[in-house]
């Protein structure tokens, strides 16, 4: 099929605006799957994706559509994730397209991630087509939302297609608009091969499956290929397309989107955004935009039973096959034993990895509080990255600590603006911009990432009754007045409870945390002191009172010296017990850090 009859497009939308349902309808309309094979959210292959109603991995479908002009077009639909944690995947999916459907819920209006992804599309030169979805809802107000799109995003929405993916209204119109407005791919079949990896995942039977967009050249089975970022070489076995079932093809030529299987054993070789070329006739330079995915949030994962350590290593290694952004390395904690320090893209990513470990691999896990990476400049001029607070050098060796700052874009209805501004100020935010668009307000803030990973998202939702939406991107490392807060139980530091906090809130955080720990640590046969310390200074102390056996119960009357002797004996025993006694710290105590709110 010639390039003039090919259209590559993706769908961008905020979570819950009906992106996956619309993809289902388009596949059904073009006859991609029979009635029997059709199921809800057909492109979301993971159970977790369906349950949470989110798309995590990018998927594609090649559809044949007979347009009103009588021609049969091939439409390549690339489904993108909508969540802020997966924004790099979105930018790769969009760079493989010439057009994008901007799906906006006609009852809710424009939200933060819609805008962020739409700007990414415009920067990449992608033709954006607005679609108003869910017009069958009683609360739908398409005219207001069309105005919002023009006002906030700045694209003409007067002819926006009005559709309802649930009932099937407007699906034919969407396909016609795609054919008319999305430009055909421009690629040279005779040039050296250049193919962009949009996504890759691990299949138990064939190894790594790569989803690619061929930009120039032709890719056939038995070709010798090379990845330009990692430099590794492989021999292709199969090439083909998803309809969304996989169908083998004799070749993929310029403008096509399809899959490549080349007997690759690990995902690290096929990184998202890398360029594939031929060994015999290589391209001069790779496609732009590739970057190695950096972990933003770190947390310790420890097995509850220490003999599960190897099982956890296996589970993480298997997950990494399907999730190149997950990084982990072994670490030892005095309090929790052997475990792993894992790096994630964001809190949702961390949540999903944890849930998949528990669900798919039956692991019982203890998770420490999430932290971010700090840049520490030492007195000798060297700079080190610290992702675990317990690894922070001594204060005497530190020149300054720099924390990661993000720029957050928040959309919120005007009646909740006050609450959101108060919240951002509590989190040490600096306001950059504030714009009113109809009833919506757009706020832009610089916020320390450390404050965001704790509980910012939950609080944002609760102060705005769920209406606020958030998108953020990393900005820079900035020096801050930060200190390390240690928790001591029975005069021993518990490394897994250490935190890096701002000096202004450190005393309050220390008191709150000590009080919380007092409630959670079970009572022992001796007094247990819980202390919060900054360096050598103790800033807060709470006591967990001892349980006491009544040793005088057997003395009926009798001499007072007899009673004193028994009490002294008990006292000496308690003193001895305190010296050798171990205090078991329950899992809830490690999560208590998350619940310590700011003032």
From Swiss-Prot:
Its EC number is 3.6.5.n1. It is found in: Cell inner membrane. It catalyses: GTP + H2O = GDP + phosphate + H(+). GO terms for biological process: positive regulation of translation. One of its GO terms (molecular function) is guanosine tetraphosphate binding. It is a peripheral membrane protein. The keyword Cell membrane applies. It is an enzyme of class 3 (hydrolase). Belongs to the TRAFAC class translation factor GTPase superfamily. Classic translation factor GTPase family. LepA subfamily. This is Elongation factor 4. The lineage of its organism: Bacteria, Pseudomonadati, Pseudomonadota, Betaproteobacteria, Nitrosomonadales. The gene is lepA.
């Amino acid at each position: 099929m010639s390039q003039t009859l090919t259209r590559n497009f993706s769908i961008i939308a905020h979570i819950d605006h009906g992106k996956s349902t619309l993809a289902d309808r388009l596949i059904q309309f073009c006859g991609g799957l029979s009635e029997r094979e059709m199921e809800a959210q057909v492109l979301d292959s993971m159970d977790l994706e369906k349950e949470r109603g989110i798309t995590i991995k990018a998927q594609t479908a090649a559809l044949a559509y007979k347009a009103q002009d009588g021609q049969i077009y091939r439409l390549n639909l690339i489904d993108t994730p909508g969540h802020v944690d997966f924004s790099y995947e979105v930018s790769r999916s969009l760079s493989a397209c010439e057009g994008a459907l901007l799906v906006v819920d006609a009852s809710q209006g424009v939200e933060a991630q819609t805008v962020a992804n739409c700007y990414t599309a415009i920067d990449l030169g992608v033709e954006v087509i607005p679609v108003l979805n869910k017009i069958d809802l009683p609360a739908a107000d398409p005219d207001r939302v069309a105005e919002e799109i023009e006002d906030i995003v700045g694209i003409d929405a007067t002819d926006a297609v009005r559709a309802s993916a649930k009932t099937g209204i407007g699906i034919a119109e969407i396909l016609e608009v795609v054919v008319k407005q999305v430009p055909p791919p421009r690629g040279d079949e005779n040039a050296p091969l250049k193919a962009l990896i949009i996504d890759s995942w691990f299949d138990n039977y064939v190894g790594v499956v790569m989803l690619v967009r061929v930009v120039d050249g032709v890719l056939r089975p038995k070709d010798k290929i090379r990845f330009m970022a990692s430099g590794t070489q492989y021999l292709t076995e199969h090439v083909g397309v998803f309809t969304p079932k996989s169908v083998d093809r004799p070749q993929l030529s310029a403008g096509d989107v399809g899959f490549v299987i080349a007997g690759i054993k690990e995902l690290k070789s096929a990184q998202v955004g890398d360029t594939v070329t031929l060994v015999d006739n290589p391209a001069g330079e790779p496609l732009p935009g590739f970057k190695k995915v950096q972990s933003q949030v770190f947390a310790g994962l420890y097995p509850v039973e220490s003999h599960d350590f190897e099982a956890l290593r296996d589970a993480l290694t298997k997950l990494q096959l399907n999730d190149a952004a997950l990084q982990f390395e072994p670490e030892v904690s005095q309090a929790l034993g052997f475990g792993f320090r894992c790096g994630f893209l964001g809190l949702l990513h961390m949540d999903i990895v944890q849930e998949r470990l528990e669900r798919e691999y039956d692991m019982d896990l203890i998770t420490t509080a999430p932290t971010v990476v700090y840049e520490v400049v030492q007195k000798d001029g060297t700079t080190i990255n610290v992702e675990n607070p317990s690894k922070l050098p001594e204060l005497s060796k530190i020149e300054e600590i720099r924390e990661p700052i993000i720029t957050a874009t928040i959309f919120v209805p005007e009646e909740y603006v006050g609450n959101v501004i108060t919240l951002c100020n509590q989190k040490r935010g600096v306001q950059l911009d504030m714009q009113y668009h109809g009833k919506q307000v757009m706020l832009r803030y610089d916020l320390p990432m450390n404050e965001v990973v704790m509980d910012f998202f939950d609080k944002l939702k609760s102060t705005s009754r769920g209406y606020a939406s958030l998108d953020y991107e990393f900005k820079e490392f900035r020096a801050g007045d930060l200190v390390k807060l240690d928790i001591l139980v029975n005069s021993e530091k518990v490394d897994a409870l250490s935190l890096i906090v701002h000096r202004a809130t450190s005393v309050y955080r220390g008191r709150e945390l000590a009080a919380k720990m007092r409630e959670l640590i079970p009572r022992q046969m001796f007094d247990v002191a819980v202390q919060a310390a900054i360096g050598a200074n103790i800033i807060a102390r709470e006591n967990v009172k001892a349980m006491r056996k009544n040793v005088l119960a057997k003395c009926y009357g009798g001499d007072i010296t007899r009673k004193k002797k028994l009490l002294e004996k008990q006292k000496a025993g308690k003193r001895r017990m305190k010296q050798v006694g171990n205090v078991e710290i329950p899992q809830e105590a490690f999560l208590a850090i998350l619940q310590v709110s700011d003032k």
